[in-house]
Swiss-Prot record:
It catalyses: D-serine = pyruvate + NH4(+). The gene is dsdA1. NCBIfam families: D_Ser_am_lyase, PRK02991.1. SUPFAM superfamilies: Tryptophan synthase beta subunit-like PLP-dependent enzymes. The modification N6-(pyridoxal phosphate)lysine is found at K118. It is an enzyme of class 4 (lyase). This is D-serine dehydratase 1. PROSITE patterns: DEHYDRATASE_SER_THR (PS00165). Keywords: Lyase, Pyridoxal phosphate. The keyword Lyase applies.
Length: 442
């Protein structure tokens, strides 16, 4: 972006200056609305989420057999919700900032099959596509026991079709593993940030991995191009997919059920704050949508991004969405948080969700490494760097009097609050890689 254009952008949006300087930045969204007001802009409804829920239930008998690690939950891919009181104390001590309320961790990092939040959306979209093909071919009815999809005739049927996706790692992992298990031919287009072990794991499942020297945007574009030339190839579009988004959104009612089981209350007097790491936006956007449907105006969602990849904060704050990239303002999009190394946000998610998100913030790679180490020490939970992005949220919210006043939170409401950090990945990181991460923390 030329200087004159840049100067006028900064004049209009002074916060951009902090982003360019790679400073850890927090922006509380002045444009949030009620769910009733913001919902029409999403273009999806509660019924769409119910349909996704029903589809995952139809596939549960299949998943329980195809992936024995899901058998205990009857083929439902869901993660644990745990309190992390020792980490809460550590954060308060390190940041000299009390965190009012209780701190919880949602362990999507340890979801079965692919060990990340992408086991929600990625697997769901592959299953939805497989179901559509099988129904259209007359091989399946909605009333069937879907475990019949494991039979050789189905494998044979699906092998005529292929799936392609562009990814920095975790989405490719979930789509690759699931597609290969169903019988699809699958190609994952991996950006330069993708970890070697993720590529190796995909190849071990018979997935074709195409590697790029460039970033996520290029990998997605190339994947899209390659798929266009083959009518039997289905491209999973992380930047625009409503199906992926709905796969993530099912998490809302699942979490509501977990809260009920644990006797946790969410209402006006007991607000819920949720902190979601954000790459291109599909995962956190879908989860936030599901949370809003489940808890209404009593849940407050925040997106967390690396200082080197603040694409969603930049897009929503300036209103330019996918018309601007972090590279346009001189930021390099290079971060240890490989799952969040995205320079241009999803235009669909930004526009759909901008009224339903309370805020956005950035944090440095070093902050993620530090918190990664503290969590391992205090709670014995090991995550990959990007999964710690949400962990910086509670102190930002608790430190901001202006945010609390904007939403009219009393001291008592904050004392009764639940702060939920969404841990997005790390359950399958090889030990030597994890040791390298731990060594970087302070």
């Amino acid at each position: 972006m030329e200087n004159a254009k840049m100067n006028s952008l900064i004049a209009q949006y002074p916060l951009v200056k902090d982003l360019v300087a790679l400073q850890e930045t927090t922006w509380f969204n002045p444009g949030t609305t009620s769910l009733a007001e913001g919902l029409p802009y999403v273009g999806l409804t509660e019924q769409d989420v119910q349909d996704a829920h029903a589809r995952l239930s139809r596939f549960a008998p299949y998943l329980a057999k195809a992936f024995p690690e899901t058998a205990a939950t009857g083929g439902i891919i869901e993660s644990e919700l745990v309190a992390i009181p020792a980490m809460q104390k550590r954060l308060e001590k390190e940041y000299h900032q009390p965190i009012a309320g209780q701190l919880l961790l949602k362990k999507d990092s340890h979801l079965p099959i692919s060990g990340s939040i992408k086991a929600r959306g990625g697997i769901y979209e592959v299953l939805a596509h497989a179901e559509k093909l099988a129904l259209e071919a007359g091989l399946l009815t909605l009333e069937d026991d879907y475990s019949k999809l494991l039979s050789p005739e189905f494998k044979q049927f699906f092998s005529q079709y292929s799936i392609a996706v562009g990814s920095t790692g975790n989405l490719g992992l979930s789509i690759g593993i699931m597609s290969a298990r169903i019988g699809f031919k699958v190609t994952v287009h991996m950006s330069a940030d993708a970890r070697a072990w993720k590529k190796a794991k995909l190849r071990s499942h018979g997935v074709t991995v195409v590697e790029y020297e460039q970033d996520y945007g290029v990998a997605v574009e190339e994947g899209r191009k390659a798929a266009q030339s083959d009518p039997n190839c289905f491209f999973i579009d992380d930047e625009n997919s409503r199906t992926l988004f709905l796969g993530y959104s099912v998490a809302g009612q699942r979490l509501k059920a977990q809260f009920a089981q644990q006797g946790r209350i969410v209402n006006a007097d007991n607000p819920l704050f949720v902190y979601l790491p954000c790459g291109v936006g599909g995962g956190p956007g879908g989860v936030a949508f599901g949370l809003k449907l489940a808890f209404g105006d009593h849940v407050h969602c925040f997106f967390a991004e690396p200082t080197h990849s603040p694409c969603m904060l930049l897009g929503v704050h300036t209103g330019l969405h996918d018309q601007i990239s972090v590279q346009d303002i001189g930021i390099d999009n290079l971060t240890a948080a490989d799952g969040l190394a995205v320079g241009r946000a999803s235009g669909f998610v930004g526009r759909a969700m901008e009224r339903l998100l309370d805020g956005f913030y950035t944090l440095s790679d070093q902050t993620m490494y530090d918190m990664l180490g503290w969590l391992a020490q205090e709670e014995g939970i090991r995550l990959e760097p990007s999964a710690l992005a949400g962990m910086a949220g509670p102190q930002r919210v608790c430190a901001s009097v202006s945010y609390q006043q904007l939403h009219g939170f009393s001291a008592e409401q904050l004392r009764n609050a639940t702060h939920l950090v969404w841990a997005t990945g790390g359950g399958m990181v090889p030990e030597e890689e994890m040791n390298q991460y731990l060594a970087k923390g302070r």
